[in-house]
């Protein structure tokens, strides 16, 4: 029986020869992930089970990234709970401040997430790891606690939607962020509800791994159970530099069944900006012309990778941030930060008048390191622009890729990069 890549991964981890959409299964996990917001809740639930130890200390990852460094007593207590549990349990994949990064940038970089894995995380953007050819999805803290205790999780097999991006003739500065914003704009924030979004085509093959990670990161913004990109030579080259354990590559059968198939030519996709207050409000950047902004954020689990830093620096080199704009740049991990320093990118940001932060999720969730006041407007490379997402309920958040964000920081309004180059 023909199956999609998602169905094949779940079938094997459930010990089954085949599965069909709608079927309930129990699957073996390769990784259970939590952060400093969700982890303490999972730990409390775990301790209620009466279980002494996690099922496998090499398959649990605890990442204190949302409030790093701690912003107040409450966040310090959350980090302390994670730290003490990691030490007590001997958790291998725990990163302390100074080594930690934004979880969905850090784990692929460190070779913790690999093709063919089944991964659950108490964070909705766990779907990022689908870019490696893994089944990865967000769960609640209670399900995560059960996963830490048993090494298993239950799933309903999702239907799959196939997205084919034809051609490689990208418009200037268009990236994976623009492809995924365009996609969400076409199908809506519930257009893939509890479905697997499978991204294929020449356009996807042409993307870097950083661009692919960005795309899968935002699958959940269309309501998807997971996003996934079948591995190719580019994937394997990336993984083989990092992997410390065996992995298995899966691909969809040619005659696998999809509930919907979308097909677009990348040449027809311009730079995108998602207007408030939903990611589905994606429009060409030209429609944002004249919209003034108070703050720009370049970073996050969506666009905090090295390629994003490089793109932003290309535009900011020799430029100055507009006098009415605050520009905050946040490399996703310490390694990305270090590489950006070695390439001279950090100097470019600072010379332009940007704040460069240690890796943190901070402003994305309205936590700290860039909160918006009443009436303020931000352009951000993050993944959500809900009401009050980055601060005051009467603030506004627009979403874009790093090229548009950097250009807009210079002009003081939403702008195409060509306006400053």
Swiss-Prot record:
Transmembrane segments: none annotated. GO terms for molecular function: 3-isopropylmalate dehydratase activity; 4 iron, 4 sulfur cluster binding; metal ion binding. It is an enzyme of class 4 (lyase). SUPFAM superfamilies: Aconitase iron-sulfur domain (SSF53732). Heterodimer of LeuC and LeuD. Catalyzes the isomerization between 2-isopropylmalate and 3-isopropylmalate, via the formation of 2-isopropylmaleate. PROSITE patterns: ACONITASE_1, ACONITASE_2. InterPro entries: Acnase/IPM_dHydase_lsu_aba_1/3, Acoase/IPM_deHydtase_lsu_aba, Aconitase_4Fe-4S_BS, Aconitase_4Fe-4S_dom, HAcnase/IPMdehydase_lsu_prok, Homoacnase/IPMdehydase_lsu, IPM_dehydratase_rel_enz, IPMI_cat. GO terms for biological process: L-leucine biosynthetic process. This is 3-isopropylmalate dehydratase large subunit. Keywords: 4Fe-4S, Amino-acid biosynthesis, Branched-chain amino acid biosynthesis, Iron, Iron-sulfur, Leucine biosynthesis, Lyase, Metal-binding. Its EC number is 4.2.1.33. Binds 1 [4Fe-4S] cluster per subunit. It catalyses: (2R,3S)-3-isopropylmalate = (2S)-2-isopropylmalate. It comes from Desulfitobacterium hafniense (strain Y51). Belongs to the aconitase/IPM isomerase family. LeuC type 2 subfamily. [4Fe-4S] cluster binds at residues 301, 361, 364. Gene3D superfamilies: Aconitase, domain 3. Its cofactor is [4Fe-4S] cluster. Pfam families: Aconitase. Pathway: Amino-acid biosynthesis; L-leucine biosynthesis; L-leucine from 3-methyl-2-oxobutanoate: step 2/4.
